[in-house]
């Protein structure tokens, strides 16, 4: 089958938020990222869209053959407003006056995110990412669960700011992806031409229909509505009832996306220790077969549909010699051989119903016997 594609991962955010914000520097996360990249390939992933972080040097090292890793499509630093989902400053860092709120978070110092306000700053951050080699731009269009100062229901960035960012990206022939959860945020983003919507777990069917009609893609991490999420040892106890309620309320989210014709791409999107992210990725593969009721649909999300989305980067796409996510003449020779039929048994590509109960130590998937990336063999256990 084709090499798999993760449409939303964070290769460079490879520890819990606390250490990344307070204790680590760029050398720590870069070393971790080398391990993360090697394990992506061993798990059968040939391509990863990195959705926030300084992955440019890693991508160059992979392309030069110095590091084993998948093709990386880096977004560069994600772009957030003050008080947005990418504003990870501690409470005292931001202060109470706009004149003393200049301290950067460690996320900004390391190039994981940029906090901007107003059209000029939004344009500068976008253009800086493009200058550094971003294949697409990632913005924070609404609130989130992992950030401290922006409730998940909030709408972020003004229309002028968003349209400035999408315009700057379009001038470079590429597109904008947005973190978002709600109807109000998604519709504002659509008004400005945003093309991919990360998460979106709480949107209505009417908004789904608009995404489909305007050629957008939904890139959700479905573990966000899994009952197992409440068992996360890092989950604050006071949030568990809400997590359980939302999981039940939006249990049909995946089915509704398909019913309304939305193209869906696989996303692991777990930020934290990289061993935890790998467990979450394998769980996500297994869990999606329940939320979309089809192994075939999940395989498309992991391969051909993701390849179509990746190609929207147009002239910023560093890999234009062939298609990704398919096996056909002229496509990139990204192949994995699997001992079993994933249409019948998703576990043969690593899918599992275990998340926090899964072994903490990473082990290769013993049913993935062969991995080829661009014609080069990285795994061969056929002998």
Residue ranges and their predicted role:
Residues 12-30, 38-41, 87-110, 145-158, ...:
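Active-site gating loops and adjacent loop-to-helix segments of metal-dependent hydrolytic enzymes
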Residues 171, 249-342, 347-349:
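His/Asp/Glu-enriched, well-ordered alpha-helical/loop segment
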Residues 234-243, 318-321, 346-360:
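Short, surface-exposed loop/helix-turn segments at secondary-structure junctions
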Residues 1-64, 85-91, 160, 189-192:
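Metal-associated gating/positioning segment near the N- to mid-region
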Residues 63-188, 196:
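Histidine/acidic-residue-rich, glycine-tolerant segments that coordinate divalent metal ions
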Residues 139-252, 263-273, 292, 316, ...:
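Active-site core of metal-dependent hydrolases
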Residues 32-58, 69-78, 134-147, 175, ...:
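Divalent metal-dependent hydrolysis catalytic cores, especially in the metallo-beta-lactamase
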